[in-house]
Amino acid sequence: MAGGSEKSVFLKWSWFLEWLTPDRATLKHIEDVIFQGRSRFQEIAVVRVSGEGKVLVLDGKTQSSESDEFMYHEALVHPAMILHGSPRKVLILGGGEGATLREVLKHRSVEKAVMVDIDETVVNVAREHLREWHRGAFDDPRAEVVIDDAWNYVASKAETGFDVVIADLVDPLEAGPATRLYSEEYYRMVKDVMNPGGVFVTQAVSISHLTEYHAIIRNTVARVFKHVESYGVYVPSFDSMWGFVVASDDKDPRILGDRGFFETRLSHQLQGAELRFLDYASMLHMLNIPKMYREAIAREKRYATLDNQVFLPA
């Protein structure tokens, strides 16, 4: 689940103005407002947008769109799951729409998937209005939905022994609830609830519009895990190449670029489950970030701690 910004506005509920950066915005035509409300944590809306279908909007920021959510969620979930090879127990941090859970449960080895989201209202709205996203995943007997703060859940070690941890969190905005969830301290706590040989993956903001912030997330993860790799995919509803960071102490993510490795594991793990976006060609493309972004990522040396937090521009 990406995003979160106060600089977005519905104009007479006909047009949706969304700021991607302080100097870049998109304008989308709204056909219908399906749901609008507020939880304890954020403004929530489900709208129908021309050319995109249903769109989940939190605090004025697009989280995912019916037309292309599968691109984001398949890209977030499957590389980490394939890298591990046979994950039995998976932790999802965030992911209130249920689509991340949906993708995790496609893997034949999964015996239990725990989804932790702070906002019960978002989960309930998704259950009712975003069935195209979760497709019944909330009711799968392997799924457990926990309403809790992702920091508290991990810090308390309410459960351990996870093979894969997937962070599908809102962006680290200064006024937002997720900033500390991108810190070195948090990533170390996450590692403590993982099994040896586990794999961690996080959404890591826009590579094309917020390159330095993607690099900071990568650098922070790299202080905790031995092997770290960035990858990205252009998501039309985000108008951006969206970034991800995958990491492990034991498994080098670059092996995902090996065709035999990738296709053998994908076929074994999914056993015919439908993927609309991800195959070997797409994986190879995601790993090959354009040169100018790779160079910018390499130049950035900052990382985030609780005492030295880095916020996205509001």
Swiss-Prot record:
Function: Catalyzes the irreversible transfer of a propylamine group from the amino donor S-adenosylmethioninamine (decarboxy-AdoMet) to putrescine (1,4-diaminobutane) to yield spermidine.
Subunit structure: Homodimer or homotetramer.
Domain (PABS): residue spans on this chain: 13-249
Protein name according to UniProt: Polyamine aminopropyltransferase
Residue sites binding spermidine per the record: H73, E97
E.C. number: 2.5.1.16
InterPro entries: PABS, PABS_CS, SAM-dependent_MTases_sf, Spermi_synthase, Spermidine_synt_N, Spermidine_synt_N_sf
Family: Belongs to the spermidine/spermine synthase family.
Main location, first listed in the record: cytoplasm
GO MF, one example: thermospermine synthase activity
Keywords annotated in UniProt: Cytoplasm, Polyamine biosynthesis, Spermidine biosynthesis, Transferase
Residue numbers annotated as active site: D168
A single BP term in Gene Ontology: spermidine biosynthetic process
Family annotation (PROSITE patterns): PABS_1, PABS_2
Pathway(s) this gene product operates in, as recorded in its UniProt entry: Amine and polyamine biosynthesis; spermidine biosynthesis; spermidine from putrescine: step 1/1
Residues binding S-methyl-5'-thioadenosine: Q42, D117, D149, A150, P177
CC annotations in GO: cytoplasm
Entry's localization field: Cytoplasm
Record field: catalytic activity: S-adenosyl 3-(methylsulfanyl)propylamine + putrescine = S-methyl-5'-thioadenosine + spermidine + H(+)
